[in-house]
Amino acid sequence: MSDRVTRRPAIERGRRVAAATVATLALALAPAMAQPNLAQAVGPTVAEPSSPASAAYRFEQWELDAADGARRYRVQLAVPRRAAPAGGFPVLYMLDGNAAFAALTADQLLALERDGTPPVIVAIGYATNLRFDTTARAYDYTPPMPGPGPTMDSGAHDRPAGGADIFLALIEQQIKPAVRERVAIDPARQSLWGHSYGGLFVLHALLRQPASFQRYIAADPSFWWQNGFILQEERQAAATAPGTCLLVMSGASAGNANNANNANNANPASAAAGQAPPPARAGIDSAAAQRMREARRAVPPETARLFVARQAQRDGLHATWREFEGASHGAMLGLSVGPALQVASGAAGPSCTLP
């Protein structure tokens, strides 16, 4: 099928995902990576002084607090060592920054330096030695629900949710200015990447405040959250500027992470973090597991593909859907980082279409 996406999405199958080796790797890792290990420590990253990536990028980080003091963020910045272009560097903002930064490889950064216009990378995570802060991300990455009372998370009703607009304001008003103070940025080449709940945030930002970024990259977004609430937001989507593009990447579970028949749908702790949960274990709250099953049933398996097809009909928006055959929800985090770097660097072209 054609890769041109002015009016229809490019449906690109796993046979074209960085050749067959990527699909083979995804299949090999699938049993161990059905979902991210939410308790895993970060470990060494490309920012280590001994990393070969230091030949192409320099690194720094800082921390800041949420306005309500309930969350503390760690921002990790990777800046190309080459001189900035006349208009500034393109930039890629990455959610779940601890995990995203850990997923970057030295080979990826060296290739960006060698082959194209390397983007500045801004990984927005939390001040913890873990890859994920599940409570914080459940609040920051989910849209506010209409009606009285606070928004609560779908899978774990004791977790506050609905802070996406507040978090987007933090990015716009505090993080972006801090980045611009440190490095020259091209305001017309800003990309946003997120996985799972982070992917949900990417879609929310596109639908509600599309001028915030020019390129939106969502990996296995949690369409099922609150019985598909993001699909209600879609009906009132804000107009996009010409040249905006969207790339949605999905794993093997029927084109997204929302398959209600997936055997991995009974762990409310993982579900509350936006992950496709592992098999049921002793002690799991059956009511929470039932809520998750109901949420997934509310969203058909083909939701991601159809969402992108509708978005491709909007004026000014290029939309592409790519499926990674054999890749689990957890594996999609790492597998989507390379394509995100391609989109942010401009290698994917103005339509976010991957080679």
Labelled PLM ranges:
Residues H204-Q214:
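Conserved hydrolase catalytic core segment
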Residues F324-G330:
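Histidine-bearing beta->alpha loop at or near hydrolase active sites
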Residues A34-F89:
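A domain-start/cap signature at the N-terminus of enzymes
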Residues A184-H195:
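Alpha/beta-hydrolase fold nucleophile elbow
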Residues D220-T320:
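The feature captures the conserved acid-bearing segment of alpha/beta-hydrolase catalytic domains
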Residues S191, R215-I217:
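Residue in the alpha/beta-hydrolase core beta-strand immediately N-terminal to the catalytic nucleophile
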Residues G87-L170, Q174-R182:
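Serine-hydrolase catalytic machinery in alpha/beta-hydrolase-like enzymes
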